[in-house]
Every structure is written in C-alpha cells, then in structure tokens.
A protein has these predicted regions:
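Glycine-rich flexible loops
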Residues: 1-253
C-alpha cells in the first residue's frame, strides 16, 4: 500500500465524525504525474483500500481543455489512464480531481455534498453568502476569497467550469483558492496536506452553519474589509516569523 493510499484511508476515517451532514463523494491525493482517488460508489461508508485507484494526470487534463468530447470518449480515456487495474467504478468526476490537483497546485482534494454548506449554496444568495467572513478563523484557514461556480452538470461540464474559474481566480486575486463552492451541488476542498484538508473542511462547515443561523436573525454581521485585511496580514506575518525561526534552528544544527 502506498503512502497516498494510506492518506486517503486516514482522511476517510477522520472525516467520518462529520457524517451524516458531510457526505464524502471522493478524496484524492497527487503523486508526480498521477493521482489516487476513491470510486464514486464508496461514498456511503468508510473508504477501503480496494476502492482506490491510480490514474495518469495528463489524459484527464486534455479532456478538460477539449472544446468538444463525447461521454463514451471521456470514459475510454479515463479507463486507459488507469495505472492500477482494479474493479473500481470509473467516474467522470475524476476530472474534477485532476484539474483541482494540478491547476490549484493542491496535493489533496476532497469533493463533498455537505448539507450545511448546501443549505446556503442552494439558497437565492448561493455562494454570495460566503463573500463575507463572520469569524477570523475562516479568513486564516479558508482564505480571504473562496472561488465559486454556478451550477454545472457533474462530469465534463463541471470540470471545464472549474478549470475556467481557477484560471480567472488567479488572474484576479494573484493566488489560488482553498475552497471551490459549487452552487446547488457541493464543495471542493484543496489542501497541501491531509491535516490542512481536515482543518479547512471543519472550518467551512462552521462558517456555513453560522451564516445559515445568522440569516434566521436578520442576516450575518460580516467582518469589515479592513478587519479581514488586518487578520490576513497578521497571519502572514506570524507564518513568516515561524518560518524564519525554523530556518534559523535548522541552520544552527
């Protein structure tokens, strides 16, 4: 069993505590030119070793950047991209993982249908409700700006929409998001390591819960833009200080 397979199994176990509100669809982890992902039909239980397959990234990226492609062609390419031949059920949603892992420069990705988040995303406000922060941890952990996508059908259409949004987001904000909010659908969490993925997921669940509750009492009291900027600046300064201290300690050894 590879380390990345172990990481996916570990994440499945740790995120189990958030069920049933957090419906885990799939978790992936990136290797060099490939990625590991669990099958779409394992989302009602803990992920098992046999649910996980390895796929080459490049063929998936070519699909996402194609102007036109048929469903049979998509499934043929995904099937041929499989490295570890298993009985795993092939899904066009694997494209989401390939695009997120590569173009968002993430190492781990969680796609979920969170009830708490979807209560907000399925409303008239949709992802706009997350344009403001109601507590400082969401700024620090989830990032100042989550990315969002209007409803798109699962598979190829959603994958290409994610590709376009990531490209646009980076041009506007000069960085990549940690969260993709999929209106009337769910969430994609993008992380550098397994622990960060769990922390972002838990914080987003709380953020959504607070926003939903606040609208029952007249609406959220969002932090001001100055508040958010100050929190972000202070957090960046703290991270830089910690990195400097670590580098200094390593150089003295």
């Amino acid at each position: 069993m590879t380390k990345l397979t172990e990481d996916i199994l570990w994440l499945s176990q740790k995120l189990e505590a958030l069920r049933p509100e957090l419906k885990i669809i799939s978790i992936s982890a990136k290797a060099n030119d490939s990625f590991f992902v669990n099958s779409a039909d394992s989302n009602t239980r803990l992920i098992a070793k046999q649910d996980i397959g390895e796929y080459r990234l490049e063929p998936m990226l070519q699909i996402a950047q194609s102007e036109y492609i048929t469903k049979p062609q998509i499934f043929e390419i995904i099937t041929n991209a499989q490295i570890s031949k298993t009985e795993q059920k092939i899904s066009s949603e694997f494209l989401i993982h390939a695009i997120g892992l590569v173009f968002a420069e993430a190492n781990y990705l969680l796609h979920s249908h969170s009830t708490k988040v979807n209560k907000v995303l399925a409303s008239k406000l949709g992802a706009k409700a997350f344009r403001g922060h109601v507590f400082e941890e969401s700024v620090i952990i989830c990032g100042k700006n989550p990315a969002s996508i209007k409803f798109a059908e699962s598979g190829y259409q959603l994958a290409t929409a994610i590709y376009r949004e990531l490209s646009s987001f980076q041009k506007i904000y000069f960085h990549l998001p940690k969260i993709l909010l999929l209106e009337n659908h769910g969430v994609v969490i993008l992380a550098k390591n397994p622990k960060e993925l769990i922390t972002i997921t838990k914080t987003l669940e709380l953020w959504a819960e607070l926003i939903y509750a606040a609208y029952q009492l007249g609406g959220p009291n969002y932090l001001s833009l100055d508040n958010v900027m100050n929190i972000e600046t202070e957090n960046r300064s703290t991270q830089n200080q910690e990195k400097t201290t670590i580098d200094k300690n390593l150089s003295e050894k």
